């Protein structure tokens, strides 16, 4: 049929062309292909990187962002392109998905960022190709475990103040590093576990002979000493078990746990031996029961992270271990049967039955080869060789899976420990930096006041006290200094050199600046006496600085007559009005604080021009009843006491 169409079609076209000269009207135009007209080349701009593709390529998946009309919201009319402020590296994989229909996961990308990009473009991660899906799931699981560990640690730290006594005890047992007492108990129990295991081993060692009897082990020759050691160990284990049982969140689940069973098995032989009689039959059963004391070694799993990781590995590899056991059982039965019939005709053969051949098959498949049972016939030797080779294959196949799981769990624990250590170190560095920054600023401020005093007195230690710090630290100190001058409050911590004591003020707070400078001046004059001037208050330039927002003006609080409920909701600095002595008042917007001063109005430490900062700090009354307003604060002066200083406090971070 196709050959026939191909044969007559050229003739039909030639006939149509031949009739055109005698046609009365032009030939109709061919119908336009709508799909071809709509298939235009579009440009996708992703964070400056331009991608080009066909529109029909994107419309293959209309349920996604690029395949639907929602992408028109991102169309830029000026550049005639679609702009997306997203990651261009991940978009390359997204665009390849539209082209090929296969979504791949780049191993160098963060799993959380990759999921966010897929969610933005409306692509489900379940359609990732088989070549990358396992890698994606592993990274997803590791990230989920990491986030879970972080959330657990944060929740534990946040819920610490509200823990009950039982919860505190259980937390101390599970994490001994939470307190010193828990850490001491942790090491004491570990020491007695080691003593118990060593005692159980040493008591079987021969310790010489007694006249008229055979050689005695150390456990019988020094029975009192070993009994005392065993009693001390069992008492410690019993107390630990009872405390854990008392502090357990769910006692039923604790009793059913593996570690609880190990604890009971480790201490029960001692108590059973105390109530047993000297009957030989009962004593034989007691000797058999004493074998369970060796299970005390499993108590080390609480003290060893490696043993816990091994337990988690065996638990996670239960299916692989089950497959290994099933394969070995099948191979043992098959080769034991073959070896029995192969050696059946041999004289003095040790393969007397199929169960007796199990021993040879197990030893051969595990490549031990004790040599107590060996085949005599040619067929037996051939099947024995096949049994040995098959054992190597059966055992070696699940081993890499177990090793990979152990490595994965081990590295997860290592990363979790490293994250916790880094978080603890980061918090410690932040605390040290905050303290150091605060102390450095106060030290530089005190040195600045002392330098001004030494400049007037002419003390030769001016050069020593005028040391400069780094540029960043100087800018930080200048920022805090300007904040002090703007708000009219002073940054203060407990300082033994100052006569002002901050017993009623918390550390790292802003208090009245005039009181702070006055005490600094008094302290500086006490430490550096001068005969030139008994008082520094007569010098006008002593208390002036390079900042134009210098002096303070006492005004009544504009919101002091508001109700107490209104005052409670206004806890922050409301407005800062900056006024010059001869300049018009500025606006209260934020930009007014960043205006650059004119050259003619450049602040001068020697001039008397002063900028007044009026501060409105509505604070709720602390000691007045509801509905009463606090009276306006008094003007700060030399006689201002500490309670008046602490009345208006603005807390500012040292960093």
Curated annotation (Swiss-Prot):
* Gene name per UniProt: KCND3
Q: Does the keyword Zinc apply?
A: yes
Region labeled Interaction with KCNIP1 and KCNIP2 — which residues?
A: 6-21, 470-487
Bias class Polar residues marks the residues at 525-548, 637-647
Task: Give the matching Pfam families.
Answer: BTB_2 (PF02214), DUF3399 (PF11879), Ion_trans (PF00520), Shal-type (PF11601)
Sites where the protein binds K(+)? 367-370
Per the record, ranges on the Cytoplasmic side are: 1-182, 247-253, 307-318, 401-655
PTM annotation (Phosphothreonine): residues: 459
- Region annotated Interaction with KCNIP1 sits at 70-78
The major lineage groups are: Eukaryota, Metazoa, Chordata, Craniata, Vertebrata
* The protein, known as: A-type voltage-gated potassium channel KCND3
Where is it made, tissue-wise? Highly expressed in heart and brain, in particular in cortex, cerebellum, amygdala and caudate nucleus. Detected at lower levels in liver, skeletal muscle, kidney and pancreas.
Q: Where in the cell is it found?
A: Cell membrane; Cell membrane, Sarcolemma; Cell projection, Dendrite
What biological function has been recorded for the protein in this entry? Pore-forming (alpha) subunit of voltage-gated A-type potassium channels that mediates transmembrane potassium transport in excitable membranes, in brain and heart. In cardiomyocytes, may generate the transient outward potassium current I(To). In neurons, may conduct the transient subthreshold somatodendritic A-type potassium current (ISA). Kinetics properties are characterized by fast activation at subthreshold membrane potentials, rapid inactivation, and quick recovery from inactivation. Channel properties are modulated by interactions with regulatory subunits.
Q: Where is this region: Disordered?
A: 525-565, 615-655
């Amino acid at each position: 049929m196709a050959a026939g169409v191909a044969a007559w079609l050229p003739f039909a076209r030639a006939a149509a062309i031949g009739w055109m000269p005698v046609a009365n009207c032009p030939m109709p135009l061919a119908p336009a292909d709508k799909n071809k007209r709509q298939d235009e080349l579009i440009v996708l701009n992703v964070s400056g990187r331009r991608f080009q593709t066909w529109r029909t390529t994107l419309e293959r998946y209309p349920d996604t962002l690029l395949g639907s009309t929602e992408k028109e919201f991102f169309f830029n009319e000026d550049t005639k392109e679609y702009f997306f402020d997203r990651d261009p590296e991940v978009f390359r994989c997204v665009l390849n998905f539209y082209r090929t229909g296969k979504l791949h996961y780049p191993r160098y990308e963060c799993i959380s960022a990759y999921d966010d990009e897929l969610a933005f473009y409306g692509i489900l991660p379940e359609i990732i190709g088989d070549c990358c899906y396992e890698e994606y799931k592993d990274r997803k699981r590791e990230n989920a475990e990491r986030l879970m560990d972080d959330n657990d640690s944060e929740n534990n730290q946040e819920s610490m103040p509200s823990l009950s006594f039982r919860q505190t005890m259980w937390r101390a047992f599970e994490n001994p590093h939470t307190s010193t007492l828990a850490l001491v108990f942790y090491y004491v129990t570990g020491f007695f576990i080691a003593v118990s295991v060593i005692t159980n081993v040493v008591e079987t060692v021969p310790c010489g002979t007694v006249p008229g009897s055979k050689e005695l082990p150390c456990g019988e020759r020094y029975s009192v000493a070993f009994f005392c050691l065993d009693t001390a160990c069992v008492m410690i284990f019993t107390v630990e078990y009872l405390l854990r049982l008392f502090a357990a969140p769910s006692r039923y689940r604790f009793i059913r746990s593996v570690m609880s069973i190990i604890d009971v098995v480790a201490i029960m032989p001692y108590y059973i031996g105390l109530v047993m009689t000297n009957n030989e039959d009962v004593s034989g059963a007691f000797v058999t029961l004493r074998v369970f004391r060796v299970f005390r070694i499993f108590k080390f799993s609480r003290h060893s992270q490696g043993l816990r990781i091994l337990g988690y590995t065996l638990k996670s590899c239960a299916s692989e271990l089950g497959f290994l056991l099933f394969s070995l059982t099948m191979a043992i039965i098959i080769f034991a049967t073959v070896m029995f019939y192969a050696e059946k005709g041999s004289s003095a053969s040790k393969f007397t039955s199929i169960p007796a051949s199990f021993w040879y098959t197990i030893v051969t498949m595990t490549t031990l080869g004790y040599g107590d049972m060996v085949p005599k016939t040619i067929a037996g030797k051939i099947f024995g060789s096949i049994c040995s080779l098959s054992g190597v294959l059966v055992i070696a196949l699940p081993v890499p899976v177990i090793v990979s799981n152990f490595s994965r769990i081990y590295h997860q624990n290592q990363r979790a420990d490293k994250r916790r250590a880094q978080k603890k170190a980061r918090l410690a560095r932040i605390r040290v930096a905050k303290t150091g920054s605060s102390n450095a600023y106060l030290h530089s401020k005190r040195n600045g006041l002392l330098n001004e005093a030494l400049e007037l007195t002419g003390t030769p230690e001016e050069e020593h006290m005028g040391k400069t710090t780094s540029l960043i630290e100087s800018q930080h100190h200048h920022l805090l200094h300007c904040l002090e001058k703007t708000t009219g409050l002073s940054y203060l911590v407990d300082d033994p050199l100052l006569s002002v004591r901050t017993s009623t003020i918390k550390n790292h707070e802003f208090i009245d600046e005039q009181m702070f400078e006055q005490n600094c001046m008094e302290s500086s004059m006490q430490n550096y006496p001068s005969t030139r001037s008994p008082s520094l208050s007569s010098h006008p330039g002593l208390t002036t600085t390079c900042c134009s927002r210098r002096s303070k003006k006492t005004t009544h609080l504009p919101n002091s007559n508001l109700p107490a409920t209104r005052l409670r909701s206004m806890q922050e600095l409301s407005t800062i009005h900056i006024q010059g002595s001869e300049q018009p008042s500025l606006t209260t917007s934020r930009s007014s604080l960043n205006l650059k001063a004119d050259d003619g109005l450049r602040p001068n430490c020697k001039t008397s021009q002063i900028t007044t900062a009026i501060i409105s700090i509505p604070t709720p009354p602390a000691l007045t009843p509801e509905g009463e307003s606090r009276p306006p604060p008094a003007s700060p002066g030399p006689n201002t006491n500490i309670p008046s200083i602490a009345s208006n406090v603005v807390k500012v971070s040292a960093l």
